Curated annotation (Swiss-Prot):
Belongs to the dUTPase family. This is Deoxyuridine 5'-triphosphate nucleotidohydrolase. The keyword Iron-sulfur does not apply. It comes from Dinoroseobacter shibae (strain DSM 16493 / NCIMB 14021 / DFL 12). Keywords: Hydrolase, Magnesium, Metal-binding, Nucleotide metabolism. This enzyme is involved in nucleotide metabolism: it produces dUMP, the immediate precursor of thymidine nucleotides and it decreases the intracellular concentration of dUTP so that uracil cannot be incorporated into DNA. The gene is dut.
């Protein structure tokens, strides 16, 4: 299945940086790349442990109604450098037209420097269902009941 996502580059964005793309035929996530403003392209962006930084992609997108774009971490960056998204998955709504930035943090012990053009996250397009929330006097009973975190055990 294919869906068209309109992409607009920011006026300052480097056109040599590829638009989001899928690395393999079966990939669910399209790679997003750092597209840094001209004044910091040479030095990159350093993220200190436990700090948060919004890394620009230089893009704006138009997601079709009925869909969202989920921004997810890249597993290799998480494993090798402790780089993750504190709000994973980040949600880009279909009516948002602002700059697409990726909120990143380092959960490791060493700073990470991201360079212009680095793959920094993945974008997954997913359908959206808007529910109707209805007040009720009671909820139907289930076998699980009110058991919350860890209540279903291990294994």
């Amino acid at each position: 299945m294919s869906l068209m996502i309109e992409v607009l580059r920011e006026p300052w964005a480097d056109e040599a940086i590829p638009l989001p793309s899928y690395a393999t035929v079966g990939a669910a996530g399209a790679d997003l790349r750092a597209n840094l403003p001209p004044e910091i392209r040479d030095q990159g962006v350093e993220i200190q442990p436990l700090c948060r930084v919004i890394v620009p992609t230089g893009l704006r997108v138009a997601i079709p109604a009925g869909y969202e774009m989920q921004i997810r971490p890249r597993s290799g960056l998480a494993l090798k450098h402790g780089l993750s998204l504190p709000n994973t998955p980040g949600t880009i709504d279909s009516d948002y037209r602002g700059p697409l930035g990726v909120l990143l943090t380092v959960i490791g012990t060493e700073a990470v420097t991201l360079h212009h053009g680095d793959r920094i996250a993945q974008a997954v397009i997913a359908p959206v269902v808007q529910a109707v929330f209805a007040p009720v006097d009671r909820l139907e009973e289930t076998a699980r009941g009110a058991g919350g975190f860890g209540s279903t055990g291990r294994g």
